[in-house]
Amino acid sequence: MHLKKALCPALCTFLIHLCLHAGERTVPVDIFLMIDKSRSMQEPGKFSSLHRWVRDEFVSSMTIQGDWITVYQFYEKPEELITLTLRSEQDRDKIISVVDSIVPNGRYTDIGRALDTVWEIQEKRKDNNRHKVLLLVTDLEHDAPLTSKYRGKQRSFQSPYLVRARRVKHDNWYEITLDMAVHDRVAHTARELYRSIAAAHSKRPTPTPPAKESSPRYTPSLD
């Protein structure tokens, strides 16, 4: 039962992703697209390839009318570029125009902050009974400034958000479908662990303090 609960969110994410690629989807979803525009994306096989995929494959072929979509670009910090409900080809053209305007020139790459932002914006729509497609497209090269809580460099960024993520490699970048439910599972596990520790501590018998030794009474000599 626990295994089934753990696999369910990841399986739902995979099935949504499969339907997107298969062109068989008829039910609109919420799409959160985060695009890496840092300088490392200027390298061969990165942004030019990523741009073509986002523009010609994802936006043009994998979205349907009724989809709600928000597009962000990120480097040091994420920036919202466009948010709309797709109702016509004109709306699709608006998204493509925004994607065409992205230039990979950001000095830093704070992937941790980008992931936090995805989680925050999807939380605002979590109760609308729509499936969520959370996409991060990046080379995973992390280089955050000293002002970031994720400061430092990582050749391939590691995060709890990415543990159950589905990664598809394209040339020298990755299409990553995120499972943000892992955030809630980690928090729940931490709370349960704390409760277990607290309960175990409360059941421990209180140690009895050792009895104090009485000092010998002084008896004056009668001699």
UniProtKB/Swiss-Prot annotation:
Residues 30-204 form the VWFA domain. SUPFAM superfamilies: vWA-like (SSF53300). CDD domains: vWFA. This is Uncharacterized protein TP_0750. The lineage of its organism: Bacteria, Pseudomonadati, Spirochaetota, Spirochaetia, Spirochaetales. Residues 1-22 form the signal peptide. Keywords: Signal. Residues 199-223 are annotated as: Disordered. Transmembrane segments: none annotated. PROSITE patterns: VWFA. The keyword Endoplasmic reticulum does not apply.
